[in-house]
C-alpha cells in the first residue's frame, strides 16, 4: 500500500488493488490448504523385484498415480494405480525386442496417525493383462510405523484372502529406515527389511517347501532431491538375498538365483 500511495495512485484504486491482492492471497491459501492431492511417479529399475522374487529380469519402468484426500483429524484416504512395463522383452538367442505391460495394481487405503504411530490399512488388487486366463490376486494389508529421531521401524502384514488354502496365505515384512537430511533439499535414506511367509504362502510360489519361514532380506540406500515444491528426483540401490535354505533350493527368487543387486532412478510430481 505504501508503495502504491507513493506512486500517486488514488485511494480507490489502491483499495481495488488491495482487494484483488487479498482475493488472490485467499485463493492461494485455499489452494495450499486443499484436502485433495495428486502425486505422479515414474520409476526405472534394472529389474522388477517383489518380496524377494524376480518378476522381471529385464529393465522395467513403473508409472504410478495417487489421489489423496486429507480428512484432517479423521485421517486420510488414498487411491493408487501402479503399473510395470518391460523396457525390453528380448529372449536369449532372439533379436526380437518389444515393450510389454506386465502388471497393473489398484490400491485403496486409509491412514491415520496416533501420536508417533502411523497406521495404514488397505486393499490391493493385482492384475496381469498379458496372462491368458486373466488371473488376478487380491490382498488386504495393515501396516504400523513408529516415528522417532533414531530409526523408524515399520511392520506390515498382507493377506491374500481369495486363496483357497485353509491355513491362510500371509506375508509379513519388518523394516527399519532413517532419513538423513544432507541439506535442505537432499535426503539420504538407508534401510533394511526382512520378509516372512507362511507355509501356505510358500506353497503358492514354490514346490517342496511346507513351512513358515523368513524369506527375503533387503538392504538399500536411497537418495532423494527436491528440485521444487512439486518436483523431486531420486536414485536407489538394493541388495536382496533369500534367507531360508529350503526356499533357496526351491528357487524362490528365480531359477538358479538366490541374490540380486538391483536399483534405479525415479521422478515424482506432486500437486
Segments from the language model and where they lie:
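Transmembrane beta-strands of outer-membrane beta-barrel pores
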Residues: 44-50, 81-89, 112-114, 125-129, ...
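Outer-membrane beta-barrel "beta-signal"
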Residues: 225, 257-271
Amino acid at each position: 500500500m505504501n508503495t502504491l500511495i507513493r506512486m500517486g495512485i488514488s485511494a480507490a484504486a489502491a483499495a481495488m488493488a488491495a482487494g484483488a491482492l487479498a482475493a488472490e492471497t485467499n485463493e492461494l491459501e485455499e489452494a495450499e490448504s486443499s484436502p485433495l492431492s495428486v502425486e505422479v511417479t515414474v520409476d526405472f529399475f534394472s529389474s522388477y523385484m517383489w518380496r524377494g522374487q524376480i518378476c522381471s529380469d529385464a529393465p522395467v519402468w513403473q508409472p504410478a498415480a495417487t489421489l489423496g484426500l486429507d480428512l484432517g483429524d479423521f485421517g486420510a484416504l488414498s487411491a493408487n494405480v501402479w503399473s510395470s512395463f518391460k523396457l525390453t522383452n528380448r529372449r536369449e538367442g532372439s533379436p526380437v525386442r518389444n515393450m510389454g505391460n506386465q502388471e497393473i495394481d489398484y490400491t485403496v487405503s486409509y491412514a491415520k496417525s496416533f501420536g508417533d504411530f502411523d497406521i495404514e490399512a488397505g486393499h490391493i488388487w493385482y492384475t496381469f493383462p498379458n496372462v491368458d486366463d486373466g488371473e488376478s490376486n487380491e490382498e488386504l494389508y495393515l501396516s504400523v510405523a513408529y516415528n522417532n529421531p533414531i530409526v523408524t521401524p515399520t511392520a506390515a502384514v498382507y493377506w491374500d484372502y481369495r486363496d483357497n488354502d485353509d491355513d491362510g496365505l500371509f506375508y509379513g515384512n519388518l523394516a527399519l529406515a532413517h532419513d538423513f537430511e544432507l541439506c535442505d533439499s537432499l535426503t539420504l535414506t538407508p534401510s533394511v527389511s526382512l520378509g516372512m511367509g507362511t507355509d501356505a504362502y510358500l506353497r503358492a510360489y514354490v514346490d517342496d517347501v511346507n513351512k513358515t519361514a523368513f524369506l527375503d532380506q533387503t538392504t538399500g540406500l536411497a537418495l532423494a532431491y527436491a528440485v521444487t515444491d512439486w518436483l523431486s528426483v531420486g536414485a536407489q540401490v538394493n541388495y536382496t538375498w533369500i534367507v531360508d535354505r529350503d526356499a533357496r533350493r526351491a528357487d524362490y527368487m528365480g531359477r538358479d538365483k538366490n541374490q540380486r543387486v538391483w536399483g534405479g532412478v525415479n521422478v515424482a510430481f506432486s500437486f
